[in-house]
Amino acid sequence: MALTAEEKQEIIAKYATHEGDTGSPEVQVALLSKRIADLTEHLKEHKHDHHSRRGMQLMIGDRRRLLDYLKRVDINRYRSLIERLGLRR
């Protein structure tokens, strides 16, 4: 269920803005989106796992704040990211 090191490196390589980039909003949002997607699948099977549901809600809030920041700072990067990730906004 957790991200493996290989999966994490693939996501970082795909969304990095420059060499060695691991902390840009794009990378952080992409990693959170993968974790949220994995937890969503887990919760479909385990409906009463409220502890994981709470953790997922916190991750969704973190992602929302990062997206709001990116939208405020650079709207073009924001639009590009939500299109690449397939997010609704």
From Swiss-Prot:
Record's subunit section: Part of the 30S ribosomal subunit. Forms a bridge to the 50S subunit in the 70S ribosome, contacting the 23S rRNA.
Function summary: One of the primary rRNA binding proteins, it binds directly to 16S rRNA where it helps nucleate assembly of the platform of the 30S subunit by binding and bridging several RNA helices of the 16S rRNA.
Protein name, per record: Small ribosomal subunit protein uS15
Gene3D superfamilies, A to Z: 6.10.250.3130, S15/NS1, RNA-binding (1.10.287.10)
Coiled-coil region list: none
Alphabetical list of Pfam families matching this protein: Ribosomal_S15
HAMAP family xrefs: Ribosomal_uS15_B
Cellular component GO terms, alphabetical: cytosolic small ribosomal subunit
Gene source species: Bifidobacterium longum (strain NCC 2705)
Family: Belongs to the universal ribosomal protein uS15 family.
